[in-house]
């Protein structure tokens, strides 16, 4: 009988821990998105841990400095059309690999100043928990995915 209660308590504790981790990761993703919307480069950088890896279909970047990451994000953000207003997460799937590493698969939409969606995209974000805070260390943005 005691074993059953112990198992129930352990399962409940694990679910609470899992839920807390998910909330912390979602908070990190939301902080990153908000900084991106505001073009707040200092805050964008605060969401990362170095070195940062950004992999696109065209190139692979390894960024070791805040200056380098700021440069990349000014380019990314600067290439958006003038009518860009905000981005919104559509779906976020989280896999925690161990207690300090997570892989986040997220889809998002970008909207103009009239609330009209003009772009759908996705990304794979790898995060590491440092001093109890989840930070991004790798990003793979893409527009579509094909299952083989």
Regions found by a protein language model. Name each.
Residues 37, 110-112, 129:
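Beta-strand elements of well-folded, non-transmembrane domains
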């Amino acid at each position: 009988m005691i074993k059953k209660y112990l198992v129930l308590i352990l399962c409940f504790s694990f679910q609470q821990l899992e839920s807390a981790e998910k909330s912390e990761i979602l908070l990190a993703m939301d902080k990153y998105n908000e900084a991106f919307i505001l073009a707040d480069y200092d805050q964008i950088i605060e969401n990362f841990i170095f070195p940062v890896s950004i992999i696109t279909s065209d190139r692979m970047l390894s960024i070791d400095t805040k200056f380098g990451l700021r440069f990349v994000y000014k380019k990314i953000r600067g290439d958006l059309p003038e009518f860009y207003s905000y981005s919104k997460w559509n779906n976020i799937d989280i896999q925690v690999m161990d207690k300090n590493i997570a892989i986040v698969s997220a889809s998002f939409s970008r909207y103009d100043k009239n609330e009209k969606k003009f772009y759908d995209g996705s990304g794979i974000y790898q995060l590491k928990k440092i001093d109890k805070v989840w930070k991004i260390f790798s990003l793979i943005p893409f527009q579509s995915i094909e299952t083989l």
